[in-house]
Design a protein with these regions (language model features):
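Catalytic machinery of carbohydrate-active enzymes
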Residues: 1-334
């Protein structure tokens, strides 16, 4: 049996496919499982042992309707029995359609009803997910007898990645970036938290993120009184995962590092504001920090600006709330 799983982006959403892939390979060990992902997100899934062949979608070469049709026809030559489209957007639909013409069965994961999204945009209802992302990923796999068993994520890295970050073992980590401005907790909050943790535990905080987060992390370090180490823009995704595997704990916004941290077993505190925390499940190693304002959640992916202009879900969240959670866990685990 030949199977193609499609999830083109982004970091977290790709990592969230790993529980499905694991169970798929366990139930059908002889099946050939291919995975299609955008080239710029390959580090999110590369090295996962449940995949036989990783296929890259290169936007420079494959984007545009005609190119996507040609790309789909090329994939159809692999003679897949099943295609599981876990992206369910225009690119994956065009590609899947071409493979379907070759005789493959195409199954798509359920997206949110369009009219619910419209009502949220019109500010007539609050945003609420119908189910967790991982549970939704499992739904099209019922055809093959797969059943949801939890969010055991996996993120991999190499010994070389681990060696590069070995010197930061046992430190706290913060990931203050996010794809949208409204999903970012305050710089003051991150800075004050790092300062208070250093005063109590004499442990520094490593700041991680992309190049776009360098200035933000510099500002956070100044607020902390210089007790942070700014590695934003200096680590690859795999190196960030290796760092988190060695970290004492991480505090992050609702962004990719949350799922990387869970995928390497790092104790993680995730801050939610405008987005719905019910997209995921939590356990003793993944803690939810959520103020729960009356107007929250208000969007699926966050916005550039708060629809109400105050962003109270983030601005009113005190570092002391997170500090108390960390102190409690530090006491219980020492």
């Amino acid at each position: 049996m030949k199977i193609l799983v499609i999830r083109l982006s982004s970091i977290g959403d790709v990592i969230l496919t790993t529980p499905v892939l694991k169970q798929l390979k366990e139930k059908y060990p002889d099946a050939a499982v291919d995975f299609l992902v955008m080239k710029n997100f390959k580090d999110s899934i590369e090295g996962v042992p449940y995949i036989d062949n990783l296929i890259f979608f290169d936007k420079k070469e494959n984007d545009g309707y005609q190119n996507m049709v040609a790309f789909g026809k090329k994939l159809a030559e692999n003679k897949y029995d099943y295609v599981f489209d876990l992206h369910s957007k225009i690119r994956s639909k065009i590609i899947s359609k071409q493979i379907k013409l070759s005789g493959a069965k195409v199954l798509v994961y359920p997206k949110r009803k369009w009219w619910k999204s419209l009502l949220v945009k019109m500010k007539l209802i609050k945003y609420h997910v119908d189910d967790t992302i991982v549970k939704n990923y499992f739904k099209p796999f019922k055809k093959l007898g797969l059943k949801y068993r939890g969010e055991q994520l996996l993120f991999t890295f190499s010994p070389k990645d681990l060696e590069k970050v070995k010197e930061y073992e046992g430190l706290f980590v913060r990931a203050p970036g996010a794809s949208k401005e409204t999903k970012k907790w305050t710089k003051k909050g991150f800075g004050n938290l790092a300062k208070k943790l250093y005063e109590k535990y004499n442990i520094k905080t490593v700041l991680i993120g992309g190049r776009e987060d360098i200035e933000r992390c510099d500002h956070i370090n100044k607020i902390s009184g210089g007790v942070c180490i700014n590695l934003a823009g200096k680590l690859s995704l795999k190196e960030s995962g290796a760092l988190l595997s060695l970290a004492k704990l991480m505090v992050t916004n609702d962004s990719g590092p949350f799922h990387i941290g869970r995928g390497v077993g790092c104790r993680t505190y995730v801050i939610f504001g405008p987005t719905d925390p019910d997209m995921f499940e939590y356990d003793e190693k993944s803690r939810l920090i959520y103020k729960g304002e009356k107007c929250s959640p208000c969007s699926l992916h966050g916005n550039r600006e708060c629809p109400k202009g105050h962003l109270n879900c983030m601005n009113k969240l005190s570092e002391d709330i997170i500090l108390k959670e960390i102190e409690k866990d530090m006491e219980n685990n020492n």
